[in-house]
Amino acid sequence: VRLGVASYSLRNFPRAQAIEMVKALGTPYINVKSVHLPYELMPDELVAARREIEAAGLQIVGGGTITFGKDTDEDVRRYFDYAKAAGMPVMVATADPAILPRVERFAKQFDIKVAIHNHGPEDRRFPSPYDVLKQVRNMDPRMGLCIDIGHTVRTGTDVVRAIADAGPRLLDLHAKDLRDLTAKGSQCVVGQGAIPIGAIFEQLQAMRYAGYVNLEYEIDPDDPLPGMQQSFAYMRGVLAGLAVRRRAQS
């Protein structure tokens, strides 16, 4: 399981500072939000920004969340052009279900994966991973899910089972923790809440999940680094514990 950062966690900081903060977390993997790579940048500016990120030793493993708002080739292509110039192998996205066949066509054309993100009870289109799965299960394999574990548990869904049921359609995962599994406002440092992080990681390993677990730390926006560092320490500790257990069993 590879741990990365969703740069939305660092939304109150400019790109150069966000890069330094990701480096401080000791991971090379970053899922970039448009606040750090604006959609309005010209292709050459996007390439330059991508080089700036890569020169710092970081790897762009995805971007988003990107909203496909219009069911037109022009609008959908704009975001794929953006993702291509930025070197994003995966676009974490949301869209009206009616737009997804068009998105699928561009995913095939550009050979870029699209991971539809579920946003919990407030999301009328995709509250839970199963709502995404229903839409993408017969589409091209590049169409899949980004399971947000915090939003998922708030729908009452068994998050470990949802990960298992998504199988190879699981393309990305947003990690966070909640003290109260029904309350969005109860987000906390990963490991201090009630989300079963250990069972989630165990399931990801059992299915040989090839994507990334990106920390999306939405609290403390003006000083997120201490909580993010604690979250990473906890997640690394869980992975180390699982590795020890695997060695003991073998």
Please report, for each region that a protein language model flagged, where it lies by residue.
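Glycine-rich, proline-tolerant flexible connector loops at the mouths of alpha/beta enzymes
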Residues: 31-54
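Vicinal oxygen chelate
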Residues: 35-40, 66, 184-188
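Short, conserved active-site loops that position catalytic residues or coordinate cofactors/metal ions
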Residues: 25-34, 58
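Histidine-acidic metal/acid-base catalytic patches
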Residues: 1-3, 11-28, 126-147, 153-250
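Conserved residues at the C-terminal ends of beta-strands
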Residues: 33, 66, 94, 176, ...
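Boundary/entry segment of secreted carbohydrate-active catalytic domains
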Residues: 1-15, 33, 62-67
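Active-site acidic/histidine proton-transfer and metal-coordination neighborhood
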Residues: 16-19, 36, 52-147, 153-156, ...
